[in-house]
Amino acid sequence: FNRKEIKDHGEGGNIIGADPVGNVLIIDDVLSAGTAARESIKILESLNSTPKIFLVGLDRQEKGNGNLSAKKELENDFGIQVSSIINLDALIKYSQNNQSFHSYVVELEGYRSNWGA
């Protein structure tokens, strides 16, 4: 994973772990506006590796830098496949259909209304 600041001691550098080589799968917990994803992709490209797939647990389906979703912008700008385990629409639908999660529906829909693409 990438560091917030480049270190000149210990492992050093701006990433932790093995040097990425060839095609790379990026795994992250959440995709919001795509800022962290763009940063990771650029770091990997600067190390001469090729990010091919960006896999996230939750795609919040937020707008990226423009009117498109962050997912669509990443796909268009970097030619990378973006996949998620679940997205905000599915989470809302699940909450609507399950009594124990009904209390979250209004808040989730409000989030989508404010930030969604």
Predicted regions located by residue number:
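Short, glycine/charge-rich flexible loops or terminal/linker lids adjacent to PRPP-binding catalytic cores
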Residues: 1-24, 35-39
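Active-site flanking residues adjacent to catalytic metal/cofactor-binding acidic residues
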Residues: 27-29
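Short active-site segment of divalent metal-dependent hydrolases/proteases
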Residues: 32
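PRPP-dependent phosphoribosyltransferase catalytic core
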Residues: 42-117
